Amino acid sequence: MKKLIATLLLITLPVLSASAHYLWIETNGTGALGQAHEIRVHYGEYTYGVFEKVEGEAFPLVSKFTLWAIAPDGTKTPLSTVAKEDHYLASFTPSQKGVYTITLNNNEIDVIDYTQYDFGIFKTHYHSTAKILVGTDGDTKTANPDGIVIKQLENDGEVIKLQVLYKGEPIAKNELKVYVSDLWSKTLFTDDNGEVSFALPWNTKYIVETTTKEEIPGTYNGDDYEFIWHCATYCIKP
């Protein structure tokens, strides 16, 4: 039991530390019609080089996720995954020109008691997205009406424009972290429209993370909680 509790605590490092365990999607940012496109799901801390093992202690606790490919016309296709050493692997074949949005949702994570850290008792809700461009650019789709989501807006390729939505509405003045490898990070805040923009100084992978608390108590799997901690990530990979 003590071992299980210690592992559960890994899920919520963001509430106590600048570092954060989170789920994120990795995939190439461009695709081609009729060609299989791979998608990876990771759990850990990208900027610290932490990639949890699929069969380790931490990843199984957040592995009840669903994964979808949303086509430019809005068609949603569920994606099955295969467990690898440090990620889950999925694949699909684009059949339309435009922007494909890959979405991951996990609202099935056990309640955690952090009263000893003066944080409370809460439930975690993860949501992740990634963009695949097949020809014509545009906005990514959103598919998380019950939580927080990061939406990429159409851009010129030099400056990334994002919008953070909570239950379908823009969330203003919300903190957003941008990570790359080797411990580099940048903190930004959304404007009144929930939007934020930033340049990409390096040709590398970027992980964006933002969180919010839903101060409504409830019960999950027989355990009461005081609030829901929502975490959204977005992967930018050239």
Q: How does the language model describe each region?
A:
Residues 21-238:
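N-terminal soluble domains immediately following signal/targeting peptides that reside
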Residues 4-14:
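Sec-dependent N-terminal signal peptides
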Residues 15-20:
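Sec/Tat signal peptide C-region and signal peptidase I cleavage site
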